[in-house]
Amino acid sequence: MRKKIVAVLCAAAAFLTMSGCKKAPPGTLTGISISYSGMCYDDTYGFSIRNDPVDGCLFSCNYKDDEWVELENIPVEDTHWQEALALAEKLGLESLPDEKKNSPGLFITDETLVSVCLIYKAPDDEIIYRYLDADGNTRSTLRDFFEDLAGQLQTEGKRGDA
């Protein structure tokens, strides 16, 4: 029985390793929510991006009916944040109703961007929401988020390899 358990655990570890996903350590950024209403997980005028705490992948998703609805999955590596930022740009416009869109680009709309919410997982598993002032520099905020997250995951991976 013990050998079967070990075999299953080894297979799961091998799958996660091959998938290119790395688990984010506690206390790091695990998500970002972009909102035009001031609420985290805005269903109507916003979208969310999170780093899944289970398999360590970056999910672009909407939060509806108290659960995440996955739209796309990007393994988080140091070169992937640009790809995720481009996807964030796309989803930022797609998440708005047609009448709210007035030009291409990141969150360019006649609606005022009210909040950028960073989501953290604390070492004690508490979820912490930190709202940033939305000052029109959202692209920079997103870029910094992805760079920081990629750096943290890369550092964690190196610590695990040592």
Question: Predicted regions span which residues?
Answer:
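Positively charged n-region of N-terminal signal peptides that target proteins for export
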Residues: M1-K4
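A short-motif feature that recognizes glycine-rich, charge-decorated loops
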Residues: S60-L96
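C-terminal motif of bacterial Sec signal peptides marking the signal peptidase cleavage site
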Residues: T17-G20
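Sec-dependent N-terminal signal peptides
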Residues: V6-A12
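Short, well-ordered, aromatic-rich surface patches in folded extracellular/luminal domains
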Residues: K22-M39, D98-A162
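Short amphipathic beta-strand/extended segments with alternating polar/hydrophobic composition
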Residues: T44-R50, E70-V76, P123-N137
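N-terminal export/targeting and maturation segments
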Residues: K22-N62, W68, P75
